[in-house]
Amino acid sequence: MCNLGVDFHDTISFAPDFFKEIFRTWGTKRYIVTGTPESRRGETIKQLEDMGITADLYDELLMGYEYNKSEMTIDHFHRMKVHKLQIIKDYNISIYFDDNPFYVEYLRNHNIIVFQTILNDKYLTEFENKNNFFTCNLQRGQFKYLADGESGQNNES
């Protein structure tokens, strides 16, 4: 039994039609996992519906803990990765999609098949200009090692 978990922001919201089709055809439980606080459940459901992700396509929306955006320091990401792992374990999710390299790195060694949604530069630029707390900009440096390797900067001396 392979229950599916998919992050909302910058995963489903990046490719809603793709995930709509996966949800529609998935044979077991389908969960949307978000770090968004429970107090914003109604707003989150509305955003999902606006993308065509209706309640009949998933089994449950699993929310994050309460926090203020001003608390989004590195400590927040450490707590959220543990929170997401607990949700994934509690709901027996064995396949999980998330865009955030911080979470992907943590989850990949916990007996979960993890897929990372890779965001294109256009999307990254559009959303980092809209929201100072936009976290998928963590992907900006993710491929720097490859670019540095092509330019010879990764060569060991």
Show the residue positions of the predicted features.
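Active-site regions of enzymes building and remodeling cell-envelope glycoconjugates
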Residues: 27-34, 44-53, 110-115, 128-143
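Alpha-helical substrate-recognition element adjacent to the catalytic core
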Residues: 1-74, 78
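Acidic, Mg2+-coordinating phosphoryl-transfer loop and its flanking beta/alpha structural elements
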Residues: 91-133
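Conserved glycosyltransferase catalytic-site signature
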Residues: 9, 81, 85, 93, ...
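Residue-level preference for short coil/turn positions at secondary-structure junctions
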Residues: 26-27, 89-92
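Non-catalytic pre-domain segments flanking phosphatase-related domains
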Residues: 1-5, 138-139, 143-157
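Short loop-to-alpha-helix "cap/lid" segments that border enzyme active sites
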Residues: 48, 77-90
